[in-house]
Amino acid sequence: MVKVIASSVRKGNVLDVDGKLYVVLTAQNFHPGKGTPVTQVDMRRISDGVKVSERYRTTEQVERAFVEDREHTFLYEDGEGFHFMNPETYDQLVMSTEDIGDLKAYLQEGMAVMLSIHEGLAIAIDLPRHVTLEIVETEPVVKGQTASSSYKPAVLSNGVRTLVPPHIQAGTRVVIATEDGSYVERAKD
């Protein structure tokens, strides 16, 4: 365990609070007009998935757990969970649907991901920044509709809804940001 000041805590860090491990979901520093600056940390307990919100003084010490980030390949999903393999050792790890969360929509078989591993257990996942998906449904272009927003709703092959430029049609492959599901560009393949 490493002691760090609360203001240096970032999303994805693993903290040890009272002997229990928590994954940081969000960490924001606030400087109120009066009083001492504080860091608001929203976390998820790894053991049971309970979400907790804590407020620390920015100079307060918190314990960050030692976590090893290793590249793994996503294999498949079944009733047990999501299966990943270390390409160097061929060891397999399983993560639950709760641990993956909303990111499961962007997982593709054979995709290289970074897993955060603590004492042999995968506790967090980091996907590539962008994935390429196909548009399966979108509205037709209405000519002369320049006064309103220049984006239109579309449904991706993974079922996620996003906004795309008017020139994108169903069947077009596009690059999507995994962080927020937003359109990046048309795929170059």
From Swiss-Prot:
Matches recorded under PROSITE patterns: EFP
GO molecular function annotation: translation elongation factor activity
Cited InterPro entries: Elong-fact-P_C, NA-bd_OB-fold, Rib_uL2_dom2, Transl_elong_fac_P/YeiP, Transl_elong_KOW-like, Transl_elong_P/YeiP_cen, Transl_elong_P/YeiP_CS, Transl_elongation_fac_P
Cross-referenced Pfam families: EFP, EFP_N, Elong-fact-P_C
Transmembrane region(s): none
Location in or out of the cell: Cytoplasm
GO biological process entries: peptide biosynthetic process
Alphabetical UniProt keywords: Cytoplasm, Elongation factor, Protein biosynthesis
Role noted for this protein: Involved in peptide bond synthesis. Stimulates efficient translation and peptide-bond synthesis on native or reconstituted 70S ribosomes in vitro. Probably functions indirectly by altering the affinity of the ribosome for aminoacyl-tRNA, thus increasing their reactivity as acceptors for peptidyl transferase.
HAMAP family per the UniProt record, alphabetical: EF_P
Family that this chain belongs to: Belongs to the elongation factor P family.
Protein name per Swiss-Prot or TrEMBL: Elongation factor P
